[in-house]
Amino acid sequence: MENSIILPIIIIAAVLIALAILFTFVPVALWISALAAGVKISIFTLIGMRLRRVVPNRVINPLIKAHKAGLNVKTNQLESHYLAGGNVDRVVNALIAAHRANIDLPFERGAAIDLAGRDVLEAVQMSVNPKVIETPFIAGIAMDGIEVKALARITVRANIDRLVGGAGEETIIARVGEGVVSTIGSSDHHKQVLENPDSISQTVLSKGLDSGTAFEILSIDIADVDIGKNIGAILQTDQAEADKNIAQAKAEERRAMAVAQEQEMVARVQEMRAKVVEAEADVPLALAEALRSGKMGVMDYMNYQNIDADTDMRDSIGKLSKENKDDDQQ
């Protein structure tokens, strides 16, 4: 009697445990939802996803969404994209948005864009609703030396075909900035830029700046133009200051050379005076030798003394005359 009661209990418990394991390992509720949505998928396919470490709802829910939107997307495509590390839900949303906007976007291209790190859904939205990129103030210098600052707004549309490998917004901003600087720099006068800012946008837009980028430039509008510094005057002032410093340095060099030359001449004068003193010291010795040898008589010596005395007297008279003349001038 007891065995007949225990056996059904064991069977019921085993069935409950088996059902719990089944519902835990096999997403039956998800399978039922897929069947209700008209998506034909085998329960063994869901079990295979579990074995391949794929979260079934990450694949089945986007598959249901794509089926309801009328897209022909296979389970294997979504699963392979999930295994590659892509965002399946975002790709499917992008495909639905592209389908509604009549944009040709195959699943392979959308998956490639997503795996390349681009937001494929945002790209599709930008293809429908163009985006406005605002640049910072771009400074350029006109030929008259006046700095002109321009603020540009760039209207771009995503180019689905060039999203993989195409340059981003930074390249667009850099190219537009280069074009604005070049256009301002080629203007003869800064007033030309102020009077006709459209010339900047027309010139820049005609250069095909969207080549090799993931965007198509629709328009470039100059939102604001300001006047900056007078760079030409600043450069001329700096150049004049530099020329003045160079001239002062050269003048100081010439003065130093003149002082050195003057000191050199003073040294040479002192050297000559020393030679004169040395020669004068030899005169008495020469006179004594001449008197001793008889080459010079006593009268000759007396005449020499008279001449020397006359010379000293003339020097004294000359000095007195010069001093009197200086006193009269004062």
Swiss-Prot record:
It is a multi-pass membrane protein. The keyword Ion transport does not apply. The chain crosses the membrane at residues 5-25, 28-48. InterPro entries: FloA. One of its GO terms (cellular component) is plasma membrane. Keywords: Cell membrane, Membrane, Transmembrane, Transmembrane helix. Its main location: membrane. It is found in: Cell membrane; Membrane raft. Found in functional membrane microdomains (FMM) that may be equivalent to eukaryotic membrane rafts. FMMs are highly dynamic and increase in number as cells age. Flotillins are thought to be important factors in membrane fluidity. Belongs to the flotillin-like FloA family. Homooligomerizes. This is Flotillin-like protein FloA. It comes from Oceanobacillus iheyensis (strain DSM 14371 / CIP 107618 / JCM 11309 / KCTC 3954 / HTE831).
